[in-house]
Swiss-Prot record:
GO terms for molecular function: glycine hydroxymethyltransferase activity; pyridoxal phosphate binding. The record marks 233 as: Plays an important role in substrate specificity. GO terms for cellular component: cytoplasm. Catalyzes the reversible interconversion of serine and glycine with tetrahydrofolate (THF) serving as the one-carbon carrier. This reaction serves as the major source of one-carbon groups required for the biosynthesis of purines, thymidylate, methionine, and other important biomolecules. Also exhibits THF-independent aldolase activity toward beta-hydroxyamino acids, producing glycine and aldehydes, via a retro-aldol mechanism. Pfam families: SHMT (PF00464). This is Serine hydroxymethyltransferase 2. Gene3D superfamilies: Aspartate Aminotransferase, domain 1, Type I PLP-dependent aspartate aminotransferase-like (Major domain). Homodimer. (6S)-5,6,7,8-tetrahydrofolate binds at residues 125, 129-131. It comes from Mesorhizobium japonicum (strain LMG 29417 / CECT 9101 / MAFF 303099). NCBIfam families: PRK00011.1.
Length: 437
């Protein structure tokens, strides 16, 4: 036990050598492996500094100017700063930066807009949607009536005509637009027309593409949607957290919430706190404010467009090597390898790629005959390698690495050789938050 007056002065390696050793191992891994998971990225040193700051010590239940603890004048300024930066970047009327992550943000939307057993339309998980958009094992699929919409049989893209027919027939109270494994641009204008015809709230989940939207590399849903949710990491390169954007007023107030004295923005805030969460993580909000400052720069706009260029280059290189991609390509930061014509499962290929220093995740493909725990696909993403400074030429080399492993999935010597080549390949690039710390 530390002597009085000495607590808190020792470094991590002095206090806990085991955690320090794990940290060093993770750092080495991230410097020598290709991070191709579409939902991962590298936060900057500034974002990491704010995440590990003394703002982690402050309890701040409530909202700026209306806290349940004293001494929050500074964090009031901090949260207000994050809110204003977020609203400015996306052109939103209202913003809430307190959700602990994307799923809690989505749960708050359910609480603010719906009653239990209301109908919810969303893209099913096997076709690119998210658990919280009405999947059967999630609260959204058990507490609400789920009405799935699907993809066109030939293009594997959202079938907006069938979606419209389903919405007219089922008249869901909420329609989700967004996903975790959908490599194409969403037609927010078409979705808004469909939602209006059905008297449905339209909610966009932009967790994967928020950085692309800020950069102008993907359409902005804010003008078309009642509510927009997101994580604060992934392509926007912030801390692990979430946020919600919304209109101030509810266009369906008289229809669905006539007895409520609160407008849409207020109901969103009340759903986050006190209905679902307690004290916000002020260190995360501080880091989000920093990430939003970074995202407002011209260099971030260049970065966002390069993400898409790199994803397209990787897609073209893999197509040229005979691989099939869901939808035939990509418009955003991700691509889905359909490996149903290959001898092994998506999980098996992902494991072999990882041994070769290529980090991916196995993923379901439309019409997947395999169980979700093994799948027939692999999802690849370009945000992290783009943050390292890689461009189109490097994507061609990455495709060659992937092909070497997948063509010889049981040749461990090949995997070991690719692992060495990948490590050498990565040393030519800096890893943000690691190389500069």
């Amino acid at each position: 036990m530390a002597e009085p007056g000495t607590y808190g002065r020792s470094s991590l390696v002095q206090v806990d050598c085991r955690v320090h050793e794990l940290l060093l191992r993770q750092r080495r891994q991230e410097r020598t492996m290709l991070k191709l998971i579409a939902s991962e990225n590298f936060a900057s040193s500034a974002v990491l500094e704010a995440t590990g700051s003394i703002f982690a010590n402050k309890y701040a239940e409530g909202y700026p100017g209306a806290r349940y603890y004293a001494g929050n004048e500074i964090v009031d300024e901090l949260e207000t700063l994050a809110i204003e930066r977020l609203k400015a970047l996306f052109g939103s009327e209202h913003a809430n930066v307190q959700p602990y992550s994307g799923s809690p943000a989505n749960q708050a939307v359910y609480r603010a807009l719906l009653s239990p057993r209301d109908k919810v339309m969303g893209l099913p998980l096997p076709e690119g949607g998210h658990l919280t958009h009405g999947w059967s094992v999630n609260f959204s699929g058990t507490d609400y009536q789920r009405v799935p919409y699907g993809l066109h049989d030939k293009t594997q893209q959202i079938d907006y005509d069938r979606l419209r027919e389903t919405a007219r027939r089922e008249r869901p109270k909420l329609i989700w637009v967004g996903g975790t494994s959908y490599p194409r641009v969403f037609d927010y204008a078409a979705m808004a027309e469909i939602a209006l015809e059905a008297n449905s709230y339209l909610v966009a989940d932009i967790a994967h593409i928020s950085g692309l939207i800020v950069a102008g590399a993907h359409p902005n849903p804010v003008v078309h949607c009642d509510v927009v949710t997101s994580t604060s990491h992934k392509s926007i390169r912030g801390p692990r957290g979430g946020f919600i954007l919304s209109k101030n007023e509810d266009r369906y107030q008289a229809l669905y919430h006539s007895t409520s004295k609160h407008n849409l923005a207020k109901r969103i805030d009340r759903a986050v706190f006190p209905q679902l969460q307690g004290g916000p993580h002020m260190n995360t909000i501080a880091a989000l404010a920093v990430a939003l400052q970074e995202a407002a720069t011209p260099s971030f706009r260049t970065y966002g467009h390069q993400i898409v260029k790199n994803a397209k280059a990787l897609a073209e290189a893999l197509l040229g090597r005979g691989y099939y991609l869901v939808t035939g390509g990509t418009d955003n930061h991700m691509l889905i390898l359909d490996l149903r014509d290959r001898p092994l499962s998506g999980k098996a290929y992902a494991e072999r790629l990882a041994r070769a220093g290529i980090i991916t995740n196995f993923d379901m493909v439309p019409g997947d005959p395999r169980d979700p725990t093994v799948t027939s696909g692999i999802r690849l993403g370009s945000p992290a390698v783009t943050s390292m400074g890689m461009r189109e030429a490097e994507m061609v080399q990455i495709a060659a690495f992937i092909d070497s492993v997948c063509r010889q999935p049981d040749d461990q010597e090949v995997h070991a050789s690719v692992r060495r080549d990948v490590a050498d390949f990565c040393t030519a690039f800096d890893v943000p938050g690691i190389s500069d710390r």
